[in-house]
């Protein structure tokens, strides 16, 4: 077995997950083993993620139903970082700035709070990629890439991560060449990440979202922007590709929750049989 690399981990668990209707809780606490209903059971998603991450200090980004998150994970010796506003993945990392500054690790692993099937081996490969790059992105090839952000790659380097709303207007030939999608899971050299946080904070993007039945303009920060900042500064981002897109499956609605619970059941059967 390969030696595990110690890293500081940040898990984004602040959002509500508005598509998970009629569930009213924090979606990272949904069960992988349903009992009374799909929404009640054992093996919370977030706990599974924390168990799979490499060794080292861990911070959970909280906001919505934060006390519920703390209650279910307090036995796991994690740090909680409050994200005052739900203002994007970059906003979540900015909320963890003090944790990152104090972490006694050379690297940082960043993951979403709804992707429970990422294997320890994939985290290790991401961290090993930091030997040659300053940042590493976990990519996957989906059966349908619509709605996903894509990695724009040159050789072994990721030049930028482009969201669906932008790349869908690319010429057909260019669209066809973009096959690797962004999982939202990263490894970054800690000092380089800290260096670019002030730049990220100074460059919010304006997005339009519905709030109380009305479309409003709000400021959000996107962690993916750091890839372009690094490239502009002469640094590089690499990538690692998963073998199976189910490994990076996010759970954001009832259909994906049911798929995840069935996948987890099959995984448990395989382990028992072995």
Regions found by a protein language model. Give the residues of each.
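Conserved N-terminal catalytic core of the sugar/cofactor nucleotidyltransferase
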Residues: 1-8, 19, 36-128
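A conserved hydrophobic helix/loop-capping motif in glycosyltransferases and polysaccharide synthases
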Residues: 8-14, 31
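Active-site glycine-centered loops adjacent to acidic/histidine catalytic or metal-binding residues
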Residues: 15, 114, 141
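Conserved core of the sugar-phosphate nucleotidyltransferase
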Residues: 118-209
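Short N-terminal binding/cap micro-motifs at the start of the first secondary-structure element
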Residues: 17-21, 146
């Amino acid at each position: 077995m390969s030696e595990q690399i110690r890293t500081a981990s940040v898990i984004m668990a602040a959002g509500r997950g508005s598509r998970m209707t009629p569930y009213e809780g924090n979606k990272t606490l949904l069960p992988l083993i349903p009992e009374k209903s799909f929404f009640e059971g054992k093996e919370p998603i977030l706990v599974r993620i924390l168990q799979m991450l490499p060794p080292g200090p861990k911070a959970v980004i909280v906001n919505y139903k934060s006390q519920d998150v703390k209650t279910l994970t307090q036995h796991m010796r994690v740090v909680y970082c409050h994200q005052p506003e739900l203002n994007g993945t970059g906003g979540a990392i900015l909320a963890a700035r003090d944790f990152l500054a104090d972490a006694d690790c050379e690297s940082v692993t960043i993951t979403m709070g709804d992707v429970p099937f990422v294997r320890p081996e994939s985290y290790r490969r991401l961290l090993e990629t930091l030997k040659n790059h300053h940042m590493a992105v976990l990519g996957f090839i989906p059966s349908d890439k619509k709605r996903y952000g894509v990695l724009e790659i040159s050789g072994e380097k990721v030049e930028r991560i482009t969201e669906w709303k932008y790349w869908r207007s690319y010429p057909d030939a260019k669209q066809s060449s973009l096959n690797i999608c962004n999982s939202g899971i990263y490894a970054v050299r800690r000092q380089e990440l800290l260096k670019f946080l002030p730049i990220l904070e100074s460059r919010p993007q304006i997005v339009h979202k519905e709030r109380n039945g009305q479309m409003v303009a709000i400021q959000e920060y996107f962690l993916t922007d750091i890839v372009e900042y690094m490239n502009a500064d002469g640094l590089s981002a690499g990538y690692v590709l998963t073998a199976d897109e189910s490994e990076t499956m996010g759970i954001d609605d009832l259909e994906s929750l049911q798929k995840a619970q069935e996948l987890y059941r099959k995984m448990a059967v395989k382990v028992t049989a072995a």
